[in-house]
Design a protein with these regions (language model features):
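Residues at the C-termini of beta-strands that transition into short coil/loop
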Residues: 50, 80, 150-153
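Acidic, PIN/NYN-like endoribonuclease modules and their adjacent C-terminal/linker elements
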Residues: 1-4, 18-19, 24-27, 112-158
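Short, well-structured N-terminal submotif of metal-dependent ribonuclease cores
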Residues: 1-48, 57-68, 74, 92-98, ...
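Short, surface-exposed, polar/charged, turn-prone segments marking secondary-structure boundaries
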Residues: 2, 32-35, 73-78, 104-106, ...
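Active-site neighborhoods of divalent-metal-dependent phosphate/nucleic-acid chemistry enzymes
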Residues: 73-134, 156
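Short, catalytically relevant binding-site loops at active-site mouths
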Residues: 12, 52-55, 83-85
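Short, flexible, glycine/charge-rich loop motifs used to bind or transfer phosphoryl groups or to couple energy/partner
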Residues: 36-37, 108-109, 139
Length: 158
């Protein structure tokens, strides 16, 4: 079976954004994201969701259009009542801060839809070594296997 990846909005933004000339870390993340997209994406079934679409529509109109075009290449995972309930549990049970509602939904949509990986550059609330164990616990207690949350760099193969 082909593994599945939920592509979170930060990855899509790094793929479609202008190359950052000022911040070397962001520039490196953009390059790693493009490398993963060009060399690895075909090894996975890729998903987004209505949450990704909502976030991708914000900001500069031309860049938003580019993000939306890229999202059209992905399958859409459903934002079900179960996903909304799990997102609320992630927020209420201190796995994520209350301001991270969209981040909780990304995790919940991936978990409820049985998606293997959640690909992100959001290291504050998602790909965060302190948050991941709490997220995993809440998902499992709710009866869902959590996605493996990682950056494009972590999902590369030699």
């Amino acid at each position: 079976m082909i593994p599945s990846v939920y592509v979170e909005t930060s990855v899509i933004s790094y793929l479609t954004g202008r190359r950052n000339q000022r911040d070397l870390i962001v520039a490196a993340h953009q390059e790693l994201t493009r490398e993963w997209w060009d060399s690895r994406r075909q090894k996975f079934t890729l998903y987004a969701s209505a949450v990704v679409i909502e976030e991708a529509r914000r900001g500069n109109a031309a860049l938003a259009q580019a993000r939306m075009e890229l999202i059209q290449e992905l399958r859409l995972a459903d934002v079900t009542p179960s996903a909304r309930e799990l997102a609320n549990r992630l927020l209420l049970e201190a796995a994520l801060p209350t301001k991270a509602n969209a981040d909780a939904l990304h995790i919940a949509v991936a978990a409820v839809n049985g998606i293997d990986y959640l690909l992100t550059w959001n290291c504050s609330h998602l790909a965060n070594a302190f948050m991941i164990p709490r997220v995993e616990k809440v998902c499992r207690v709710a009866g869902f296997e959590p996605p493996y949350i990682c950056t494009p760099q972590e999902l590369m193969e030699d």
